[in-house]
């Protein structure tokens, strides 16, 4: 089995992408698997991507981080400043990308998880559907698309089904759901 690939779309300054990396790394270790994964974070803002690549955050932006997470995944680099440890930073690649205008996708491989939270809300309903269809083309055949709750209402991408629980808005291909192989 190859590595797990995750795309954090609209990742801003990287907090979401690094949180996904921490979550995936922990889940793989808890499952007794060697953590083999990569996270790709994309955003339209060059400044945000520059900051994401640095991986340095103020304590005030990390209020939900517990002591164990600080110890395992961050180094203190100044007063109230923390940097994501190099091992984790190496697993996360950040790219400047505009999903509306990029003709050839920067994401070359099929993704197992596409995480797109709070980005679609800025688009009209028809454009949201168009973008979601575009994103599904980047999914591995057993992949999962996770959207912000309420970003896509009363519509499901063709060939996909919503995954339980209803507290999240996630979709996977119908064949995958029927076979019980969802991520």
Functional labels for PLM-detected ranges:
Residues 3-14, 40:
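Conserved class I S-adenosyl-L-methionine
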Residues 13-31:
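Conserved SAM-binding loop of SAM-dependent methyltransferases across substrates and taxa
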Residues 1-4, 33-34:
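Short helix-loop-beta connector
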Residues 113, 155-183:
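Core SAM-dependent methyltransferase catalytic element
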Residues 9, 30-115, 119-127, 152-154:
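Extended basic-aromatic, gly/pro-enriched interface segments that bind polyanionic ligands
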Residues 141-149:
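Conserved beta-strand signature within the Rossmann-like core of class I S-adenosyl-L-methionine
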Residues 129-141:
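A short glycine-rich, Lys/Arg-flanked "PGG" loop and its adjoining helix->strand segment in the class I
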